[in-house]
Amino acid sequence: MSNSMDDVANFAQALFVIGSNTTEQHPVFGTMLRRAVKNRGVRLIVADPRRIDLCEFAALHLRHKPGTDIALLNGLMYIILEKGWEDKKFIQEHCEGFDEFKATVMQYPPEKTSEITGVSVGTLYRAAEIMGTVKPMAVIWAMGITQHIVGVRNVMTLANLQMLLGNMGVPGGGVNPLRGQNNVQGACDMGGLPNVFPAYQPVTSDEARAKFAKAWGLTKKDEFGKMKDEKGADFILHPSSFIPEKVGMTVTEMIPNILEGKTHALYILGEDPVMSDPDTAHIRKCLEKVDFLVLQEIFPSETSAYADVLLPGVSFAEKSGTFTNTERRVQMVHKAIQPLGEARPDWQITAELAKRILALQTSEVLETSEVSAPYAGWDYNSTSDIMAEINALAPSYAGISHARLEK
């Protein structure tokens, strides 16, 4: 989110909610939006193929056909340009490529947009008028925008709308995605994506790879390390396996790639792809063929039947640490009960696995000096040690510590 939830609720004069059933999926923020409409008279526009709860409070409901988000947004921006409601000063001072952008938008006149989306021409004009004349307006979206094959383009088009209107960098404006689960933001911040290290430092960057290689004690790419397998036989490990130069696979790529022989093992943590990913029959077929599957979970799932190894994790009530919420607020949590049975916190399981892998390596790969490689050993005593590493290597988390969060 470019603006905080309090900022949006207290300063926005208009709200555009698209692809988000906010009161159901984000009830706290949804309640804040409803209060803003009822108590401050904020103008609310909802764009959703369904009639959701927020529609009861909306000035307009744009009930467009599924998958026509870009056409809808381009059509609205056509009208904004036609009526001269764009923020010319903001565009001149802060935007690039306006002529190319305008040429694209002008391909979506209201009649064509209405035909594509199913939204009447009159409703399009009323929505564009609110957007163009009531400032500032906050744009809010969730999985209904991102979970598409054109999800990135959907988001870029929403950003174009806000730049066209000059609603960026102001209280009550901005582009505000609501994340799908409570710590999705934190997982992404920590590099839980195929193309970045923690804090969105690109894996394709020589500088970023060198930074993490030094901190984690990994050699340069042209150096090799020896390892021994369980029978004591030597084999060669290329350190680029740990510091990749190329962007990795997404979830929707790695599982189908099993059938193509490109994925041989899966380590799944807190996820049930059989139920969550599209085409369940295809996912089952892939998991039946994978050479090795490790599943780290807190309860049996549809995916459990395909696991070669099951590792018992813990629930939120059994672990301490931090969550980063949708507005990037870092919050401390403390365990309420001790882990049950053989279950362990996820960080302990991961660290123990890493230590056992590192035990197979020689110093040709791993620097043992704490000065040259301060985070090479996975020797964490608590989650506060992990946070210390995070704020040392992830600039956006610099200065954050458990001690400060406790205050």
Name each model-derived stretch.
Residues M1-N183, A187, F197, P202-G225, ...:
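Cofactor-pocket helix-loop regions in the catalytic cores of large enzyme subunits
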Residues G191-G192:
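Conserved N-terminal structural segment that caps and organizes enzyme catalytic cores in eukaryotes
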